[in-house]
Amino acid sequence: MLRTSIATSRQVLSSPVCPKASAQWLRSSSAGRANTTTRRHYAILQEPNGALRSSSSPSVAAVSDVSQRASNSTNTKRPNTSDLNLRSAASPSTGSTLKPETVLVAPVSPPRQGQTSPGSAASAPEPTAAPPPSPPPTPPTPKTGRLRRFLLYLFLTTGLAYAGGVWYSLRSDNFYDFFTEYAPYGEDAVLYLEERDFRNRFPNATKKNNRRAVTPIDGGAQVTIPGGSGLSWKVAEEQQEGSDISKKGPHMSAVDKNKATKDTKRVEKTKGGVTSKSPAQREEAVKTKPATEGVKTQPAKVEETPREPAIPAVTTIDHLVLNTEDEPVVQDLLKVFNDIITVISADAPSSFSGPVAKAKEELEKIGKRILALKSDAQASAQKEINDAHASFDKSAAKLIRRIDEMRAEDATKFREEFEAERERIAQSYQEKINTELQRVHEVAEQRLRNELVEQAIELNRKFLSDVKNLVEHERESRLSKLAELVSSVAELERLTAGWSDVIDINLKTQQLQVAVDAVRTTLENSNVPRPFIRELAAVKKLASNDEVVSAAIDSISPVAYQRGIPSSAQLVDRFRRVASEVRKASLLPENAGITSHAASFVLSKVMLKKHGSPAGNDVESTLTRAENFLEEGNLDEAAREMNSLKGWAKLLSKDWLADVRRVLEVKQALEVIETEARLRCLQVE
């Protein structure tokens, strides 16, 4: 966004926005006098009774009231005159155009009795009779001042809006554009405030203490063209000198000509790189060309020695260039040095050309040395890296070879063991599954065969009865029972579709029973706890729409089907080990120490083991009853007996109780699923 300079804003702000108001009281006084002098007056008539009567409608009091109001409206001090006929003539300074002789003198009514006018210059003669009382003066109409108030408010509102616009223009560029474009003198006001703010923040900005002297730009020698010719005075002088062959000049001697030529060549050699002429020299060459062509009739050719330019050619110092783009330090140093050369070239390049050339040579040497050191360092580093890579490759190859050999041996061994175990397990499970599937298929096929036979018999019976009825009714009317035939066919189709649904339900129930049996077989025949996630997932998939089966599966702990559950034999074996440890801690109190543990361990060796079904709540009786329940296969009662223990005995049997609970949860879930499968079969039948 472009803004005008601050100097222009000063000039605009220094000039007044509106012309200066002139003095108002002179014009008001002259206007009052003009109104007074132009007012018409009437003669005073005397009535027969001796009273004076004025024929004019306005009374003297009204006239004085009007003059008083005119004097008050001007807000200036005027002479207190109560008599209108003694008014002084207008002075020349008031600027009035009326002459004193043309002013009409208004008659003055006689003053009231007992009233004198201290400022009057003359008094009227007293009448013979008292004048009638004059009517009371009309009260002046109060001025509302509505226009004055409106102008005052308008001026204040405009001033506040203008000041707010100037303030907001300093903070918003968009509003600045709008304000400076449409508001009068808006741009000047904003620039003035910006200048004031700049001067407040930077009071020393206008001082010239630290400013560098700026060298004026030399635009070349000024050429003055005379009014009568388009050529310069130098060329005109040379033409006059060349036109006079008799005068002494370079054409009079060939030696001088050769000398001038040699000097010219020497000067051109010393200049070296300066090959182009300045614009002033080219203009002089163009202007002198027609002058020399006009003197072809001379016996000797006139040649001028090249003049030295008025201002010597400015020779700049070339910047230093090094091919070190990948060295930031050298580039920074080169940039600083080139900046110094730029400053020297702008000021005095000839005086510093020697030191700058030496500095250039030193910097070039330094750059070459840095590049050489860098190349050597890179070569040595690359060699070390290559050696390290070679050694690492050898070590890695050896390590990989050894790891591959070990991995191959382990893989071969594990593969053989896995294949053998997988074949054995697959064979055993395949035999069991084949047996179960064969039995289930036989039962299902036999059941379906019986049901189909029953359905066929029933359908044949119905069909025969229907045919008989149709034949009987056909005798009466061949097409009378066509609707009944259609309904019978629809009923037949419905029955067929219903039996297909029954068959599907039976198949799903059989598959669910087989999946439950597979889970139970997996749990009973495993020697170690084995996860049964796959079998349980098959059960859940077959009974995806049954809420009871889903709830039973969800009641099983994830630890049970992820890690497996122990068999009954494993539970009994582990119970015996736990029972021995519980007997050792049976005599320990709750807060027992090392001595109590030792005493309990010793006394447990002496205690006699109970047999049968002993009664009592002691630890030995509880262990005996739990063992009996385990031998009978009643895990629920055994868990109840072990759960009744307290203290250290219950703490030691906590893990065993957790395993028993998981086993009971799984068995209970399987029983619920089997019951649900039987219930489905009953519902179908």
Curated annotation (Swiss-Prot):
Component of the MICOS complex, a large protein complex of the mitochondrial inner membrane that plays crucial roles in the maintenance of crista junctions, inner membrane architecture, and formation of contact sites to the outer membrane. Plays a role in keeping cristae membranes connected to the inner boundary membrane. Also promotes protein import via the mitochondrial intermembrane space assembly (MIA) pathway. The gene is MIC60. The chain crosses the membrane at residues 150-169. Residues 54-67, 116-127 have a biased composition (Low complexity). It comes from Paracoccidioides lutzii (strain ATCC MYA-826 / Pb01) (Paracoccidioides brasiliensis). Residues 43-149 are mitochondrial matrix. This is MICOS complex subunit MIC60. Keywords: Coiled coil, Membrane, Mitochondrion, Mitochondrion inner membrane, Transit peptide, Transmembrane, Transmembrane helix. Component of the mitochondrial contact site and cristae organizing system (MICOS) complex.
